[in-house]
Amino acid sequence: MEQNNLIEQFQKLEPLVVATADYELQMRLQQLRDTYGTMLRYMVQGMDDPNASRIYNDLVSQAHVLGDRAERVLRIQKQSSDRYVITYKTLRAEVSLSDMVGKLRNYNEALRLLRDEPNERENIQQHDVEQHQRGREEMLLMLFGRVWTSDVWSKSEQETALSMLMDDVVFTEDKCVLISATTLALQEMFDERKLMLLFDAYLLPELELSQRALVGMMIALRQHNERIKQQPEVQSRFSLLCDDANFVRDTFRVFMQMQYSRLTDTVSEKMRSDIIPTILQSTKFKQTQFGIEELDDYLTQNGENPEWFKNRMADTRAQAKIQEMGEMLMEGADVYMSTFSQMKNNVFFQQIAHWFYPFSADLPAVADILGRLGGETSSVFGAMLRYAPFCDSDKFSFTFMLSMIGVQGQEGLSKSLTGSLSHDELSEMLETKKTKKRAADISRQYIFDLYRFFTLYPFHQQFQNPFNKELPQFTPLAHDVFQPLLNNYDEVLSLAEFFMRKGVYQEAIDLFEHLLPQKVEEDVDLWQKIGFCEQKQGRLEEAFESYKTAYDLNPNSQWTLKHLASVSFQGEWYSEAEVYYQLLLDDDPDNLRYLRRKAGCLMKQNLFDEAIPLLYKALYLDENSVEDQNNLAWCQLHEGQFDKARELYGKVLSTHADQPSAHFNLACTYLAEGNIQQAYPLFREAYLMQSVSDDGDAQFVRDFNEAFDELQPVSNMDNERGQALLDAVRLGI
């Protein structure tokens, strides 16, 4: 179908439509064939129809829709265990969408009246409220199921849904559920009218509705990119929205938030294995033992209690991890997934619709629990549910957890939450009403809700997961429908930088390159960032060229110069790297890293005599550096300065006798001098220390042969004697 070959489409559709035994679908297929036949007859008769192209595209689109509808009918007929089919079959066909919306509106209106009217008989009023709440809940579940499992909408159904969104009587929470049901329905099959409803919902003044609609819209557009190529009205509507700076900003933010949610597994693993264990080690969490035995021994000898220091160290580390967790949360990471993922077994979550409910204390399942809490405890948890940065799904989980831990557990948890607050701070928290959420918070937390559904719902495998890592990344370059967004330089740049920070380097490069960097000084940053991403990918030659372009445009950038030197060294272009490290040393002559890197470049080029002064200077700056001593001794060996090399290697051995390399390096000095008698025991000791590892013998042979080959120019030992010495060392002669 994607090739837009109508004859082939009709031939493929026929057995599918016939299998449904649905007369309406069969007649629809015949109508499409007849229309196409009429169009072809006009063409062969030489009649020029200016609408031919539009009619053809419309036929292609309708053929797609017919295929979707036929597949849906067959699914309902044959897949009885599918949650979609089960939900569809439990709904009464004679109850229309309009009827459901009308009844739901009546419940909403009654609840508003009961809340606003003073009633002396409070018990009767409360009974009425509960009765209407349960009726509202039942109707909302039916509405969700009807919309999710619906066929393509008629014009009247679209108008009914839109009227519900525009109705001031209907609660915002109920409208949110309608938007989520529409989003889920679009995952099952493309429906232009449902997609248009999301466009309309984005324009509503309530942020809870507009942001939820935007997320659903982006998921649907991404999934149905190919279909939308035959939908000029959808393309036109999206392009029109792209003229709105607020829409563009919101859309790019959702791209980042959706992309970040793909990293939730990584974030959860860090929370489980690093952040939470470290925080729990703090004395504030009654943890006192950390197994720092060396510190224990040292402090005990001096008479101090080691627990004092352990607790202080643990508190410091915990504070750092709490700060890190806060920074992750501020950036948009889903840090609570690992905590609440174990709390989705409540019967409440057996209903698909409940995964998409905005949290509300009025829901019967929640009201029953919160109503049984004590006075201050109830206030504390109520405030927490207002302030905590939890998504709605996690707020439900938290509430259900309260019902399981009992009164004592509730009081203990309440005290732990408020223990660090002063009386005034606690009073302010309890008295402050719910603050208005920002658009970014609403969309992020809704995306968290979606992520939980598509990964934790028991039958989640029956749904197309938009967070699946096998799908393209969340970038406007991945789908044609998002092309109008690419005209916004600053937003594209921000998204590219986001991808770069998150290690999604190819998409970052593509976005940077879309900005068409020119060889002018104003674009130096772009060339630097492209080079950085290319270097991270291991594309060293391309990274070098990007860095070189940036350097030519601005030779005063130390950052560019450092990366030019680094990528040259990494690419083993040592002569170029030497030049760049010297330029860095000209500006910072005592920089140890630059001294060592330049010396390394010279050694790789066998310019040992030029490397020696650099290594002497490095040792002067860091006299205890074993690395510099070994490198200097190696250069001296190659220059025939055997006494100096032996002295340095001997010094290293005296302080690092437990390291095989210390014995091996000194043995090489004697090997270069041809003194096998002195070399053998040192080689043998290195071999015995190294051979305990699995690959120790093979690694020693590789090291010996490499050293032997490198020392050949200054050694008189031939290959046969070298092999004999190696065999003797391995056999322990």
Please report, for each region that a protein language model flagged, where it lies by residue.
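Alpha-solenoid helical-repeat scaffolds
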Residues: 354-559, 563
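Conserved structural position within tetratricopeptide repeats
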Residues: 514-517, 548-552, 582-586, 616-620, ...
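TPR alpha-solenoid repeat register
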Residues: 213, 491, 525-526, 560, ...
